[in-house]
Design a protein with these regions (language model features):
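Second RecA-like catalytic domain
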Residues: 1-5, 13, 55-195
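Conserved segment of the helicase C-terminal RecA-like domain
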Residues: 3, 9-61, 75-79
Length: 195
């Protein structure tokens, strides 16, 4: 790579424990991430990094990125740790320990999904969920769909729920994009529209 154009932005996953959702928001990256981008150009020869922000903006950024384990939904991590018998996630010696509230939230979510018993043991569904490399909510949906004989349809829906909204609306072509998207509209259900 000879040249890098750095916007200073990236889509960063953040979990909101209040709503129980993870969203990818365009956010400012840390100084360390900016330096990493700069380091990508010119490794094998001369390179150029153009930053689309000023020095003052760079200096106002956080020095390092908050570790993902401190900003993510921990339900999947907890499910895998229990499945692999790695011990109590609340006592695990993480390099950057997650907040205790996030661990409690992960356990609560797994109990609600039927993956754990009240005393934190894996259920039969929990063992199946741990085998699927997905958010536990999506793996639970797939297991339920299998039981209803709708595996194919449920996998399509789970895949659609796992990504950002695929409907792109370029600012200068919003009207045209809306017309095209209307072809796939189903007034009864967003899920039917996805299928």
């Amino acid at each position: 790579i000879r040249a890098v154009v750095d916007t200073g932005l990236a889509r960063i996953a953040r979990y909101n424990p209040r709503t129980g959702t993870t969203s990818l928001r365009v956010s400012r990256i840390s100084q360390a991430s900016c330096e990493q981008r700069r380091g990508r150009c010119g490794r094998t020869g001369p390179g150029l990094c153009v930053r689309l922000y000023g020095e003052e903006d760079f200096q106002s950024r956080e020095p390092f990125t908050v570790p993902e384990i401190q900003r993510a939904n921990l339900a999947e991590v907890i499910l895998q740790m229990i499945s692999l018998r790695l011990g109590d996630p609340g006592r695990f010696p993480f390099i950057d320990p997650p907040p205790a509230a996030a661990i409690r939230d992960g356990y609560r979510s797994l109990r609600e999904l039927g993956a754990l018993t009240a005393n934190q043991r894996l259920t039969a569904n929990g063992r199946l969920m741990a085998r699927l490399p997905l958010d536990p909510r999506l793996s639970r949906i797939i297991i339920e769909g299998m039981g209803l004989g709708a595996t194919r349809e449920i996998i399509v829906l789970a895949a659609a729920l796992a990504i950002q909204d695929p409907r792109v609306r370029p600012p200068d072509k919003e009207h045209k994009a809306d017309e095209v998207h209307r072809q796939f509209l189903d007034r009864k259900s967003d899920f039917l529209a996805l299928l």
